[in-house]
Amino acid sequence: NQIQQVLMPYEGHPQQHRVFNSVKQLDKKIKTIGYMHTVLPCLPTDYIRREGFPEKILVNGQNQKKILNSFLGWDNSQVEAITSLRYTEQNKKNFQKQIFFPYYINNEKKIFKYFKNLILNSKPGHLPNLKVRNHPAMKYSKKHLNLKYLVETFLEKNKNRFSNNELNQNISIFIGSTASVIEALERGINAIHICENTIFDLYHTQLWESILVNEVTTNVFSYKLKEFGKCITIGKNNISFDNLTL
């Protein structure tokens, strides 16, 4: 049977462009489709349209489609916003009352300084009792383990500043460059974002028009959504590629 289309995950990586190029060299009639299974990063330069790009990409939110169309060189017809196949009503994480570490940390002492400043400038009882959640791929990283020690030691010494109540059950803290904060917002979490570098880490309103951003302290920001379902359209439990017209 003749191949009509090639569909593969797409994160803007060079090797993915090479695959799409190779497919077109074999047969120009084959349609190439990239599926963005995650969320665009804070600074989405990897997704600038360039040689080897797929003919069409599927994204899981209207806000992401607009970013690609308005800022990254993609034509409107080349980007389709679909209901997420990854972020579903059933497949959801526990985001409540946690401190999420990113994959990459440059300077853990700098991050800890921003974290400590946030806590000391918050009203006692405003934040819930928090637990550290390290990135699963970084459980042996010296920087991550050092930051974990600093944060947990500080939390223990200042435990009287934290209290669980009905108003703060959905508060969590996210550190560095992470897409998890977007999923958390779409699932009703009040997200606080500690940015090691605001250029690379912050979700700017200039790109993410459906997010309200408020600076809390230096390099620390709180997010709220203007409207749910714009950054990510959470999928139903039974959706698959079979439900899509590609």
Name each model feature, range by range.
Residues 1-83, 179-181:
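Active-site and donor-binding regions of nucleotide-sugar-utilizing enzymes
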Residues 8-12, 36-37, 59-62, 101-107, ...:
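Structural motif
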Residues 15-17, 42-44, 64-68, 89-90, ...:
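Short, charged/polar "capping" segments at the starts of alpha-helices
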Residues 18-24, 70-72, 117-121, 141-155, ...:
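Short, aromatic/basic amphipathic alpha-helical patches
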Residues 24-26, 123-124, 185:
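Anion (oxyanion) recognition and catalysis
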Residues 54, 72-81, 148-149, 170-171, ...:
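Catalytic binding pocket for nucleotide-activated donors in carbohydrate/polymer assembly enzymes
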Residues 74-150:
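Conserved catalytic-core segment of nucleotide-activated headgroup transferases in glycan assembly
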Residues 156-168, 219:
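Short acidic low-complexity segments
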